[in-house]
């Protein structure tokens, strides 16, 4: 059920995001810039197609996809990845794979907030968004 995720969300807190970006291989300058911004995320659905648009003063990104189907994604840090997004137990699970590496971005709704857990290897970052 995607309905709880739909709408526009603003980042209100972030924990361990720089370490996560470092694990991804994001360079120092880009990590510093990305760490300062408070992005707005809009999640929408049109039929079977979902869209996640992320907007910030650093960079805007947009992905459109069908749940459970692999798609090509260029990330904000310019990685070319194969992504798959699924719904599992009330969470939206976004898996990115590239060059033998993998990261998982898990979105879930907790107390009307969107909690985003970004994990790569043993590094976990938690980012919390409130609905606008």
Swiss-Prot record:
Annotated GO biological process: long-chain fatty acid transport
Residue numbers of Phosphoserine PTMs: 13-14, 44, 91
UniProt xrefs under Gene3D superfamilies: 2.40.128.20
Organism, scientific name: Homo sapiens (Human)
UniProt cross-references to InterPro entries, sorted A to Z: Calycin, Fatty_acid-bd, ILBP, Lipocln_cytosolic_FA-bd_dom
Gene: FABP9
SUPFAM superfamilies: Lipocalins
Keywords: Cytoplasm, Lipid-binding, Phosphoprotein, Transport
GO MF: long-chain fatty acid binding
Protein family: Belongs to the calycin superfamily. Fatty-acid binding protein (FABP) family.
GO cellular component terms attached to this protein's record: cytosol; nucleus
Segments crossing the lipid bilayer: none
Major localization class: cytoplasm
Entry protein name: Fatty acid-binding protein 9
Subcellular location: Cytoplasm
Disulphides: none
């Amino acid at each position: 059920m995607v309905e709880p995720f739909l709408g526009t969300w603003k980042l209100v807190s972030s924990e361990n995001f720089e370490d996560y970006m470092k694990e991804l291989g994001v360079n120092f300058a880009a990590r510093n810039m990305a760490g300062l911004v408070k992005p707005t995320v809009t999640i929408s659905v049109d039929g079977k197609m979902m869209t996640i648009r992320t907007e910030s003063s650093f960079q805007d990104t947009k992905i459109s996809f069908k749940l459970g189907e692999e798609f090509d994604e260029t990330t904000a840090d310019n990685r070319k990845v194969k992504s798959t997004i699924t719904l599992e137990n009330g969470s939206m699970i976004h898996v990115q794979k590239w060059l033998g590496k993998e990261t998982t971005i898990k979105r879930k709704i907790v107390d009307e907030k969107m909690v985003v857990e970004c994990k790569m290897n043993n590094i976990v970052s938690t980012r919390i968004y409130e609905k606008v």
